[in-house]
Structures are given as C-alpha cells and as structure tokens.
Swiss-Prot record:
It comes from Acinetobacter baylyi (strain ATCC 33305 / BD413 / ADP1). This is Phosphopantetheine adenylyltransferase. It holds the Pfam family CTP_transf_like. HAMAP family: PPAT_bact (MF_00151). The record marks H19 as: Transition state stabilizer. Reversibly transfers an adenylyl group from ATP to 4'-phosphopantetheine, yielding dephospho-CoA (dPCoA) and pyrophosphate. Belongs to the bacterial CoaD family. ATP binds at T11, F12, H19, G90, L91, R92, E100, Y125, S126, F127, I128, S129, S130, T131. Substrate binds at T11, K43, L75, R89.
Length: 163
C-alpha cells in the first residue's frame, strides 16, 4: 500500500497554535505531512521565507512525519511535484468554506487527481488568524496564548529591531 502524503499550504506569517493543531491532527491521519510555506509575494510577509520555515520547524519539531518546504507558484503544480494524496485546508468559518470550495474545484479542473481535505480547528483555536496575531503583536499586545513560544520570541526580536 502506498503512503499517504498531504500538503498543508499557507504563508504561515506567522505560524499559530491553530496551524500547529491542524498539523498535529493531520500527522495522525496521513503518513507524511508537508508544511508548504508559500513565498507570498502578494502578501508582503513580515517574516522572511527562511524565518517562517524555521518558526514552523521549531513549532512542530515534536512531529516526526512532518517536513517543511518553501514553494512558489501554483499549488496544483506543487501538488503534482510532491506526488501528494491531498491538500489540507483549515476552515474556521463559513466564509472560509466558500473560498476553499471554489479553490478546490478550480484546482480539480487543472488536475483531476487534485483532492482537498478540510479540517475545522479545535474550538479554542477557531478565532486565531496570522493577520490578527500580527496586528496584536505590532501594537505590543501579548500573543503568547495564540502562537508557539518561538514566535513570541521572534516578535520580541522584531520589536528590538524597530518594528
């Protein structure tokens, strides 16, 4: 039987406890989980690709069937390159579903092997987003409840650098 391989794509700017929750749960469902960190040119990320990969690695080091890859370009092409079984997406709200449903169907039009798997977050993480976390951190609020310790320290470093 072939191994199951799921891709969890995102910009992860920064990785949050909600992301960690989804990857942890996916690691029990799939043989291999690829955390695919998008370069995200259009989003102008706070953290560089290298920083985001490192923060994800530090935050998920307890999981042994997870790998971390930076990527650019179409997700469906990356899906093929990785010989993936499916793509994992988190759904926090109905508005997420509408967008993800459209995206999954578009990707399936590009490659009929494309499959999307949707997970809802654990209740305590359902409201967390990287955007909200960045805004709280920018205003020097306490984000320790929302992100792994490595991210808290990365924000502290950004503040020391004048952010």
């Amino acid at each position: 039987m072939s191994k199951t391989r799921v891709i969890y794509p995102g910009t992860f700017d920064p990785i949050t406890n909600g992301h960690v929750d989804l990857v942890t749960r996916a690691s029990r469902m799939f043989d291999e989980v690829v955390v695919a960190i998008a370069i995200g040119h259009h989003k102008k990320p706070l953290f560089s690709l290298e920083e985001r990969v490192k923060l994800a690695q530090l935050s998920l080091s307890h999981l042994h069937n997870v790998e971390f890859v930076g990527f650019d370009g179409l997700l469906v092409n990356f899906f093929r390159e990785q010989n993936a079984t499916a793509v994992l997406r988190g759904l926090r709200a109905v508005s997420d579903f509408e967008y993800e449903f459209q995206l999954a169907n578009m990707n399936r039009q590009l490659d009929h092997h494309f499959e999307a798997v949707f997970l809802t977050p654990s209740e305590q993480y359902s409201f967390i987003s990287s955007t909200l976390v960045r805004e709280i951190a920018r205003l020097r609020g306490d984000v320790a409840k929302f992100v792994p310790q490595a991210v808290v320290e990365a924000f502290e470093y950004k503040h020391q650098q004048g952010w």
